[in-house]
Amino acid sequence: SLFFKQDKSHFSQDGHKLVSNFLENKIKKLKIIIKDKKIKKSKTKRKKTKSKHTYILGISAFYHDSAATLIKDGEIIAAAQEERFSRQKNDRRFPVSAINYCLEKGNIQQEDLAGIAYYDNTYLTLERMLWSFAKTAPNSEKAWCHTMPSWVKYKLFIPKLIREKLKYNGKIFQNFHHRSHLASAFFASPYKKAAILTVDGVGEWATASIGIGNGNKIKMLKEMNFPDSIGLLYSAFTQFTGFKVNSGEYKMMGLAPY
């Protein structure tokens, strides 16, 4: 049976089991057939190094534009989107090729990594989605059927999936979605201290956030939560004008000057 756990969650351990059982029973009743291709294991031909450097691998997958990045002693040395290798636009699959590229660029193997970071807290994201499906039922049934298979197969088990596909036994971190946005903005900037604003469609619950970056730390000050979302409003207009959501938003930006 399905089971997942998290140290800091809105749910208790018993709550996790209830959600897992609920999902399992729901999927069985819907009789959904999952036809996703089997994910290949990530490998690198480079020999293991005896480096004294600290390497962190960042991974984004299963939403849109899967990607990987490698950080060496606090600096980005490699980054790539999976679509650059697969030639599939907005490729959302586990970024095997992007990970291999980053490891080979750094001339390291998986065992040389101090840790692997995933950009999102999938358990809290599922909590928000279940709330949304319940609030909009029965109109949400089609979305439920389309969305849940990937959650049951992949997204609830990100740490396990990473360990299996990369043959990795080290530390794995799941960050909060908007903290990942704040970090990518601040740590790549030339500033030692700055206010940081991030606005997107939705993360776990947050849709916009503001924080302060100072040195190697970020303090979250305020969040706006789902269903209030400037980003989702932008996506609604993207769809209204005939473009694909999570892909065609830049075309709306291009239309703005006209």
Predicted regions and their residues:
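Proteins with a high burden of low-complexity, intrinsically disordered sequence enriched in S/T/G/P/A and R
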Residues: 1-4, 28-36, 67-69, 237, ...
